[in-house]
Amino acid sequence: MRIKFLALSLGLAILLAGNMSSVADASWLSKAMDRLETSNAKLSPSWPKAEQYRHYRPGQVIGAYLPAEDMKIAGVSLGTSFDAVKASLGQPTSEKRDELTYGGIKFGHSLMQDSRPIVWYITVSNRDAVTARGIAVGDNLKKVMDVYGRPDFIDFNNRWFYGYLRYNSDNIRGIFFEHNGSKVTKLIVSDN
C-alpha cells in the first residue's frame, strides 16, 4: 500500500513539474524572441533610425497624405462628431468633455481647435482595434515596415510616422506608431 502511495505521489509530482516547466519554457522562449527581435532591429543597417530624419528645414513638407481609409479606426474617421461616434459604437466606457473612450480606443478633441466635439485624434493602447492595413498594438516593427514601408519620419520620441507633416510645426496628418524598440505599444491617428 505504501509503495502504491509513493508511486502515485511521484507520478503526480512529475506530472505537475512537467506542466510547470513547459509554462516557464514558453515564457522564457517568448522573452528570448523579444530580446532577439530588439537586438536584430538595433543592429540592422537597413532599420530606420531617428538621426536619419533630422536634416529637414523648418516648414519643409515630409511625406504625403494617407488615403482616407487609413485615417479610420473602428470605422470612425477624423472629423466625425462625438454624437456620430456614439451612434456608431454605442455608449463609451468613459466620457469626458474632450474625449470618448471605448476600452483601449480613445477619440479625442482639442477644445482650442473647435467648440464642437469633433474627433481630431484617435489613440489605440491595446488590441481592441487595428489600422485599416491590419497593424495592431503588439505587432512587431518588421510587420509595420512590411505593410507601410520605411517611416516618412521618426520624431524625437522615436515614434514612427506615416503621412503628411511640415517639419517643426503642428501641421501633421497621419499615423504614429509608438514602440518599445521591437513591438508597437500605441497607435495614434492625428490631424493637427
Task: List each language-model region with its residue ranges.
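A cross-family detector of function-defining hotspots
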Residues: A32, S44-K72, S77-I118, S125-R127, ...
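Amphipathic, non-transmembrane alpha-helical stretches in extra-cytosolic proteins
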Residues: L36-L43
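Glycine-rich loop/hinge motif
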Residues: R133
